[in-house]
Amino acid sequence: MRILRVDPSDAATVRACYEVQTAAAQAEDPLGPPKTVRFLRAFLAEGFEANPCESWAAFSAGTDMTAHGWYWLELPDRENLDRATLIIVVRPRPDHAVGRDLLRHAGQRARANGRTILSLMARQGSPLEAFLHSAGARHVYTEARRALDLRTAAPGHFTALREAAARHAAGYSLITWSGVTPERHLGDVARLENAMNDAPREAGVEDSVWDADRVRERHDSSVLRMGVRAYSVAAVHDATGELAALTQLEVDPDSPEWGHQGMTAVDRPHRGHRLGLLVKAAMLDWLADAEPQLEQVETGNADANEHMISINEALGFRILDPSWTWLELPVTTLLDNTVLDKDVLAAGEH
């Protein structure tokens, strides 16, 4: 087996990785939103926030360019320089050694880039989770993915929720924009990104520090690069004119029946006014006109984030699939563990 660096500009290699992605999703995630070739190409190149990253794929020996699996390794360059985030995708049970060898290779690449900890996810109760624990990973927290089926939502449901929330939000007004962040809001969006540091995460993870330049260079550039239709709804504090809350959602034009929830944040001084529910309900009202073909919206929440879960459930989100486990794996532990010499890593996606 050959493990080769993925060139995201090489259409044939990206297509080979996409075929792996599709096969894995059909086996493990048949209810979830489909990924598109264009989205995967952009993701392999720069991930979600344009952090440095690299991707590698496993091919058969010889000249056969059928991929059996691939991984994506994110290497943050502003905070958490000791960490790397890893995603591995392999075909359903082609050969247990594929996932094992990709994991070992990813550990070697992480170490070569000065990283000492891998952060990764696995389905709770899956063979992958069991394998990662046997390789030395420790559980950090769990999260579940939820979906909102707009086809079954009662008429007027989101409007009623928005109006009910607005009664607790005197002194705030709603604004919207599509596409990249307007220049005048860059600083406020950065402040709300910093408010996301309150969300559950691994112990020892450093706060992300956002400013206007980072919003433009990392978030907005990702919107443009991936070619998604991006929507933002914000609550403005009337007395100061500052943004107090923000929710964002994206629609892939190649898969327009699904919406993908981005960040939802309420700045600390403005919490307690139901602004989270207000902006999210307003978003869904807006999309009924802006994206009439939209059928479902997906989101994910850490189990500990009870407040956001309660908002999503009020909107109508329901569990889409079992909980996922976030794990932390020291690179040295991974590479020194003899369990990697055994054919025990089941195929699938994480």
Regions found by a protein language model. Give the residues of each.
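Conserved beta-strand-loop-alpha-helix junction that forms the acyl-donor binding cleft
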Residues: 91-92, 119-128, 267-271, 296-309, ...
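Short gly/pro-enriched beta-turn/loop segments at secondary-structure junctions
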Residues: 167-170, 184, 226-230, 244
